[in-house]
Swiss-Prot record:
Keywords: Cytoplasm, Glycolysis, Lyase, Magnesium, Metal-binding, Secreted
Species lineage: Bacteria, Bacillati, Actinomycetota, Actinomycetes, Mycobacteriales
Residue positions binding Mg(2+): 241, 282, 309
Organism: Corynebacterium diphtheriae (strain ATCC 700971 / NCTC 13129 / Biotype gravis)
Cofactor(s), by name: Mg(2+)
Catalytic activity: (2R)-2-phosphoglycerate = phosphoenolpyruvate + H2O
Primary role: Catalyzes the reversible conversion of 2-phosphoglycerate (2-PG) into phosphoenolpyruvate (PEP). It is essential for the degradation of carbohydrates via glycolysis.
Name the record gives this protein: Enolase
Length: 425
């Protein structure tokens, strides 16, 4: 395998107009990899540290310090390393940083290099990224969890739930699933317009109408599914990202005008899954409510996927604790929450070995980088959420999955309804 010859980073803009890190790695055989690092709006307190410059430039959100850390310390530390030694390279960067949460060099600096190394190594090996990482058996295309109504921290719609997603579980292939999702998305626009509501978009390409409640938003989506000619629950299921830490204050959940306990929120979710074909609920409780998650999983975990995002932050140590406590039953996978590819691999492997499902995920601040599409297939996640079928930084990932499905040809398998516990057994 070729050796790393040169490592370089620059400051670019993400989809929200904020700076982020782009890293490039060049190998001595001429191979090259480039990676753009995403950034979240609603971030868990346990996430790896995203290094920002502060000051007046870019309203304090510049990343020149992270860029300099790549161009100086990290570049020197990994120069000459064999590019296929991903784990050794990631470990070297973690050791160089020397902090528990990558706060000295910045997870955004380390992750950019980690991904760029893998891309360069894949090019050197003459393999697509999903095949280089996942090996010859990587063949499952994920269910696209399309965020078509944006709320919470992703929009100014007034609704507390952050994401309302559709999951085309009845499709026979990824390409058919993408078509179904796009048709419902356009149908939803006409439904929203017919009710005199705004068709403005949130950060992730979903509509952000001002609706009075979670149920009102779900009713719009169900109407759109039916208008597009599909059957809710059979063809297309629903999913929520509640991001409840965003409205948890002073020991209570400030949800839809009331103050609720974890037990009361559990009853809200039980009612929702009884009334709507919901297959997945993400971050239903505050990120450190271990007891609440255990109780909620015992109550409804056999009926619905309970996904830990801020709860697990793609961290193997937190996931291990969740497994021991039987808290949640699925892991949201965000590479920038943990900061290296190999730590991400470890988290996904731990989840799968313990019967937890996994959903690969973008962030609300994205770039045109399509790495997560390849990772979803490589790691056998079975689900991916990367926004609405709109805005090029979202669609880029879906289009990459179309390419992968075409490359796999008859070997491609679409995860479909088998990805969710509601349809098991």
């Amino acid at each position: 395998m070729a050796d790393i010859m040169h490592v370089f980073a620059r400051e670019i803009l993400d989809s929200r107009g904020n700076p982020t890190v782009e890293a490039e790695v060049f190998l001595d055989d001429g191979s090259h990899g480039v990676a753009g690092v995403p950034s979240g709006a609603s971030t868990g307190v346990h996430e790896a540290h995203e290094l920002r410059d502060g000051g007046e430039r870019y309203l304090g959100k510049g990343v020149l310090n992270a860029v300099n850390n790549v161009n100086e310390e990290i570049a020197d530390a990994i120069a000459g390393a064999e590019a296929d030694d991903q784990r050794l390279i990631d470990q070297a960067m973690i050791a160089l940083d020397g902090t528990e949460n990558k706060s000295r060099l910045g997870a955004n600096a380390i992750l950019g290099v980690s991904i760029a190394v893998a891309k360069a190594a894949a090019e050197s090996a003459g393999l697509p990224l999903y095949r280089y990482i996942g090996g010859p058996n990587a063949h499952v295309l994920p269910v696209p969890m399309m965020n078509i109504v944006n709320g919470g921290a992703h929009a100014d719609s007034g609704v507390d739930v952050q994401e309302f997603m559709i999951a085309p579980i009845g499709a026979e292939s990824f390409s058919e699933a993408l078509r179904m999702g796009a048709e419902v998305y356009h149908s939803l626009k006409s439904v929203i317009k017919s009710k005199g509501l705004s068709t403005g978009l949130g950060d992730e390409g979903g509509f952000a109408p001002s609706v009075e409640s979670t149920k009102a938003a779900l009713d719009l989506i169900v109407e759109a599914i039916e208008k597009a000619g599909f059957k809710p629950g059979a063809d297309i299921a629903l999913a929520l990202d509640v991001a409840s830490s965003e409205f948890y204050k002073d020991g209570k959940y400030h949800f839809e005008g009331g103050e609720h306990t974890a037990e009361e929120m559990a009853k809200v979710y039980e009612q929702l899954i009884a009334e709507y074909p919901i297959v997945s609920i993400e971050d239903p409780l505050q990120e450190d409510d271990w007891e609440g998650y255990t109780a909620l999983t015992a109550a409804i975990g056999d009926k619905v996927q309970i996904v830990g995002d801020d709860f697990f932050v793609t961290n193997p140590a937190r996931l291990k604790e969740g497994i021991e406590k039987k808290a949640a039953n699925a892991l949201l996978v965000k590479v920038n929450q943990i900061g290296t590819l190999t730590e991400t691999f470890d988290a996904v492997d731990l989840a799968h070995r313990n019967g937890y499902r996994t959903m690969m995920s973008h962030r609300s601040g994205e770039t045109e980088d399509t790495t997560i599409a390849d990772l979803a297939v490589a790691l056998g996640c079975g689900q991916i959420k990367t926004g609405a079928p709109a805005r090029s930084e979202r669609v880029a990932k879906y289009n990459q999955l179309l390419r992968i499905e075409q490359q796999l040809d008859d070997a491609a398998v679409y995860a479909g309804r088998s990805a969710f516990p509601r349809f098991q057994g």
